[in-house]
From Swiss-Prot:
It comes from the Eukaryota. It is a single-pass type II membrane protein. This is Membrane steroid-binding protein 1. Belongs to the cytochrome b5 family. MAPR subfamily. Regulated by both phytochromes and cryptochromes. Interacts with BAK1 (via extracellular region). InterPro entries: Cyt_B5-like_heme/steroid-bd (IPR001199), Cyt_B5-like_heme/steroid_sf (IPR036400), MAPR/NEUFC/NENF-like (IPR050577). Residues 74-171 are annotated as: Steroid-binding. It comes from Arabidopsis thaliana (Mouse-ear cress). One of its GO terms (cellular component) is endoplasmic reticulum. It is found in: Cell membrane; Endosome membrane. GO terms for biological process: negative regulation of cell growth; regulation of lignin biosynthetic process. Keywords: Cell membrane, Endosome, Lipid-binding, Membrane, Signal-anchor, Steroid-binding, Transmembrane, Transmembrane helix.
Amino acid sequence: MALELWQTLKEAIHAYTGLSPVVFFTALALAFAIYQVISGWFASPFDDVNRHQRARSLAQEEEPPIPQPVQVGEITEEELKQYDGSDPQKPLLMAIKHQIYDVTQSRMFYGPGGPYALFAGKDASRALAKMSFEEKDLTWDVSGLGPFELDALQDWEYKFMSKYAKVGTVKVAGSEPETASVSEPTENVEQDAHVTTTPGKTVVDKSDDAPAETVLKKEE
């Protein structure tokens, strides 16, 4: 059946065009290619613009709106890990120098699968300063860093301050310097004096910036 149809088609092509089937289909393919090239020359430049605009509008309709930043206040490092992007219902947070920023709008970078996803849900100050992706550098501790690394960290902080909303701080145990205790003055002014008692006399040696004085008092 198929052979009979092909034979009939060959005879029709030869009868109407005088060409063999191979030549006929080759000429047909060339004509289509030439048509595509010529039609591209006369295409309106606004067609591509309109096409891109339609694609962009469709993409915006598919993406859910970014929620407004929510203040989380002072939280611990463990609590910050809940905002690493694994839960799409929660904001995407990241901290620099104990300051927490909402980076939800840059989920393509800091969300799961992004190039900086390792930093999400953490205070990765040291890793940002060193541009390191090692697990040991995912910490707020920047001790031992050089001036160039600290400058790089400062640049990151300025970028986050200008681009993202600050929503809280990280409470880290031991991150604050200890406050030196100040002793209260005593009411007895002779507390700082060194008193030495010898038979028949009492020697009181007062320490001061001035030359030391020795007071002798005979025992009554």
